[in-house]
Amino acid sequence: MIQVESTLQVADNSGAKKVACIKVLGGSHRRYASVGDIVVVSVKEAIPHSKVKKGDVMKAVIVRTAKEVRRMDGSYIKFDGNAAVLLSTQGEPIGTRIFGPVARELRAMNFMKIISLAPEVL
């Protein structure tokens, strides 16, 4: 459950380490984002000489949330923390590697590139 000013870990090798949500996309007054939703983020922490710099504003897709997500079969899944993958303007991931597991819900949102790069899909 991500809202404005939530901080997230970055689960790819784009160079950003931490980002902060500045807008939840989808609806005029949408308050929360969950796994598979797209948010606008600002880079708060980045490693030097990387693809992204501190202060960059870009889109990201949520891949893990600490708040549990209910599945159609009635089961729930939750992770230890909140994480996102940075997206280019075309909607493709900026990084070439994904770190940590990602939720299966991304497959339904057609983020196949992220699913194929992830080491584990839960």
UniProtKB/Swiss-Prot annotation:
One GO process term, biological-process aspect: translation
Keywords: Ribonucleoprotein, Ribosomal protein, RNA-binding, rRNA-binding
CDD domains cross-referenced by the UniProt entry: Ribosomal_uL14
Entry superkingdom: Bacteria
Coiled coil spans: none
GO CC, any one term: cytosolic large ribosomal subunit
InterPro entries noted in UniProt: Ribosomal_uL14, Ribosomal_uL14_bac-type, Ribosomal_uL14_CS, Ribosomal_uL14_sf
SMART domains according to UniProt: Ribosomal_L14
Reported function: Binds to 23S rRNA. Forms part of two intersubunit bridges in the 70S ribosome.
Subunit structure: Part of the 50S ribosomal subunit. Forms a cluster with proteins L3 and L19. In the 70S ribosome, L14 and L19 interact and together make contacts with the 16S rRNA in bridges B5 and B8.
Similarity-based family: Belongs to the universal ribosomal protein uL14 family.
Name of the protein described by the UniProt record: Large ribosomal subunit protein uL14
Gene name tied to this protein: rplN
